[in-house]
């Protein structure tokens, strides 16, 4: 079954594709792998992803996010998969953000969700 993206989702996918082709080609993954990067990802690339708003896609707007949904996030991951892009986006922007949004206390949401959006925690 083909997924039909709306205009905003398609735009996000196109931006992700262009950004990742330019900044994170497969050779970039190999460099990180071969240098045995302790983090397992490029900190500058992660900061750029945060600046594009990717870390806040699933975070509700009231906490500084975009509440854009799983389809939007999925379109980014599709492009990341094509480039073998290592990043903390899944662990932080999907798992962390979703768990806190769905099961966190108000205090936890107020404390952690803005930090996920601004990239200060991973």
Residue ranges: model-predicted function:
Residues 2-25, 54, 62-63:
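Flavin-dependent oxidoreductase catalytic core characteristic
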Residues 24-122:
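Glycine-rich flavin
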